[in-house]
UniProtKB/Swiss-Prot annotation:
Keywords: ATP-binding, Magnesium, Nucleotide-binding, One-carbon metabolism, Transferase. It catalyses: L-methionine + ATP + H2O = S-adenosyl-L-methionine + phosphate + diphosphate. The gene is mat. The keyword NADP does not apply. This is S-adenosylmethionine synthase. Its EC number is 2.5.1.6. ATP binds at residues 136-141. Its cofactor is Mg(2+). Pfam families: AdoMet_Synthase. It comes from the Archaea. GO terms for biological process: one-carbon metabolic process; S-adenosylmethionine biosynthetic process. Pathway: Amino-acid biosynthesis; S-adenosyl-L-methionine biosynthesis; S-adenosyl-L-methionine from L-methionine: step 1/1. GO terms for molecular function: ATP binding; magnesium ion binding; methionine adenosyltransferase activity.
Length: 398
């Protein structure tokens, strides 16, 4: 059956030529990102448990995880958490299959704790966190969906979007957070995982505002704090040169008041310890960014089941489509993908698969169009590959 693939030329100013561009990334220790990470870790653990015990992934969604902030008293050289952070794993899961009882809550709690151990290295899971789990049972009609066809049918009438390639600013914002935590943090453990990077490009000038929760026990005094944030600033300025020749100004923790020594200190590396709650889907989209200059879906990707939940599959799929089009069709300057499902219809037959393309100057759009159609059709023909990639942990959701 032929697919409804529509590729059109987009008569719009390319992102790099627009005057104003805004890009944001919430770091992995931001309360919203922690919620995303927990939800996705639980979903993947349930997938593995279902495959191990039942031979197939069963219905579940864990995309309602919530974090209620605790209370802390950070200080140079130490500090303590006075009231634990409350983390509630919420969702639906299949708890029995063909007579086999499944320990879904135990699997979820273990997955959540393992995720925190790997990502929040200064958080004491015995003292700093109360972990709770409330998983209801999936409705029988939705559970049946998983058994009907080789190609799953859509759980809802919904859409997913994706774009490529990343702009210079998008690359800078994304890699600033990633490199600070995966590279500089190994030499400067005071850098907390709770970080927000906000990028503004105004013509040829880029401003990066970084809010980074520093960990007090690794910092002796205010002078040490100032030296560390200055080293971070220099690091980011140098990093940015790998992605742009534009002028880049870096600002770190602009809310600090150095005269009163009121600075952004934490005990655990996240503001969830003191007044900042978190929820799934309030942060980064599945490409790791928040991009108001680009089309975005408001769907939370993390925690949704990777079999037939369109809010997950089509957002991840459209992003992979866009990236592959850029790789395989070099004449494309910008591409925007939109996939729309119909409830109970096969997910490899979207109601529409739309691609809007800005070709590079002097390029034949008809050539670009035909090559883009091939990429889109190929991905839809292999749509369950997205499910496999998710379960193996090969795709990020935030």
């Amino acid at each position: 059956m032929a697919r409804n693939i529509k590729v059109e030329e987009l008569l719009q100013t390319p992102i790099e030529k627009q005057r104003i561009e805004l890009v944001e990334r919430k770091g992995i220790g931001h309360p919203d990102s922690i919620s995303d990470g927990l939800a996705e870790a639980v979903s993947r653990a349930l997938c593995r448990e279902y495959i191990s015990k039942c031979g197939t992934v069963l219905h579940h969604n864990t995309d309602e995880t919530q974090i209620v902030a605790g209370r802390s008293s950070p200080k140079f050289g130490g500090g303590e958490v006075l009231q634990p952070i409350y983390m509630l794993l919420v969702g639906r899961a299949t708890k029995e299959f063909e007579g086999v009882e499944l320990a879904t809550e135990s699997v979820a709690l273990q997955a959540a704790r393992n995720y925190l151990r790997k990502t929040m290295v200064n958080m004491d899971l015995e003292r700093d966190v109360i972990m709770d789990c409330k998983l209801g049972t999936g409705s029988s009609d939705l559970r049946d969906v998983f058994k009907r066809d080789r190609v799953p049918v859509a759980n809802d009438t919904s859409f997913g979007v994706g774009h490529a390639p990343f702009s210079e600013l998008e690359n800078i914002v994304y890699n600033t957070e990633r490199r600070l935590l995966t590279d500089l943090k190994s030499r400067m453990p005071a850098i907390g995982e709770d970080m927000k990077v906000m990028g503004l490009r105004d013509g040829e000038d880029i401003a990066l505002t970084i809010c980074s929760g520093m960990i007090g026990k690794y910092i002796d005094d205010l002078d040490s704090y100032i030296n560390m944030t200055q080293e971070m600033k220099i690091y980011v300025e140098e990093l940015a040169t790998h992605y742009t020749e534009r002028d880049v100004n870096v600002y770190i923790n602009t809310g600090d008041n150095l005269k009163t020594s009121c600075v952004f200190l934490t005990v655990t590396g996240t503001s969830a310890e003191m007044g900042d709650d978190g929820s799934v889907g309030r942060g980064n989209r599945c490409n790791g960014l928040i991009t108001p200059n680009r089309p975005m879906s408001m769907e939370a990707t993390s925690g949704k089941n990777p079999i037939n939940h369109i809010g997950k599959i089509y957002n991840l799929l459209s992003t992979q489509m866009a990236r592959d089009i850029v790789k395989q069709v070099p004449e494309v300057q910008d591409v925007y993908i939109r996939l729309l499902s119909q409830i109970a219809k096969p997910i490899d037959q979207p109601l529409v698969a739309s691609a809007q393309i800005i070709p590079k100057e002097g390029t034949s759009f008809e050539k670009v169009k035909s090559e883009a159609e091939v990429v889109i059709d190929d991905w839809l023909s292999n749509v369950t590959k997205i499910t496999e990639m998710v379960i193996r942990g090969e795709l990020n959701t935030f």
